[in-house]
Amino acid sequence: MSLKIFIDGAEGTTGLQLRQRLLLHPEVKLISINSDKRKDLNHKLEKFSEADLIFLCLPDEESKKTVYEINKQFGSQKVIIDASSAHRIDKGWKYGFPELNVDQKTLIRDTTRITNPGCYATGALALIRPLIDNNIIDKSATLNINAVSGYTGGGKKLIEYFSNQDKEAFLYYSTFLDHKHLKEITRYGLLKKNPIFCPSVGAFPQGMAVSLPLHFDWMKEGISGRKIHAIFKERYRLEEFVSLNPLNSKDSLTKEGFLSPQILIGTNYLNISIFSNDLSGQIWLIARLDNLGKGASGAAVQNMNLKFGFNENLGTKLLK
């Protein structure tokens, strides 16, 4: 029997890719809604009542209002996966980054309220948590995270901005150091203070790279690039969607020596590169992913699969 799914916000950037993925999933059936009724609450409540799972791909405030109405009508029995940032640090919601730690998949399976991570947060936490969990860096460390994302991460307005005419190769934003992903990075990174987060948007549609540069001076004594790489290798060795390149590998670079943020488009994978200069005592960790894949709709499908006992990779990849 197919799992009945309703996507609220299926016409948005994340919603469209989520729908594309779910159409390829052999275990689900999508509940449709007429375009002229998609903002009609009473009509949506009828669709919610039919659904085993509700995906929310809405702006934050709309998501909060919709969850309120679902709770009022159905209590906590309906399974919700929220792709917005509205509930990412709320009590009663489980954080939908399955690779966060060894217990996270169980937490996702055992709840009816799953909040999908932000795309930047996914990359940042994949780099930070192994270091914190193994006491390599202190929870009070001042971290500096740099990142670049394709412009689809900014939704329809940014897509229109970059699509209409030639634009700069990339642009910095969130210059007041208040990006909305910071709270979840700090909370789930187990950090005592916000990192300095410097995001930018590139003149390409999809793909992203999140990087964490560190000095060995900030770490416990006797650390080296090889030891850090071994920690990451052990942490992610059983994770299907996280790959780790060999230490200081040139194979992940283009022939010109560049590291492209666009290698995983259409997938739910996250790739980690570690570059270490033990002589200078510096290390650079870089996570790459598709901002609309592992950073959004792919992760949402993965969380659905975990929740309902399907194979974890079913429907997570878009066909080219």
Where are these regions (language model features)?
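N-terminal Rossmann-like NAD(P) cofactor-binding subdomain of oxidoreductases
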Residues: S2-K167, Y173-S174, F275-D278, L314, ...
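Predominant activation on well-ordered alpha-helical scaffold segments within soluble catalytic domains
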Residues: R19, Y68, L125-I132, L182-T186, ...
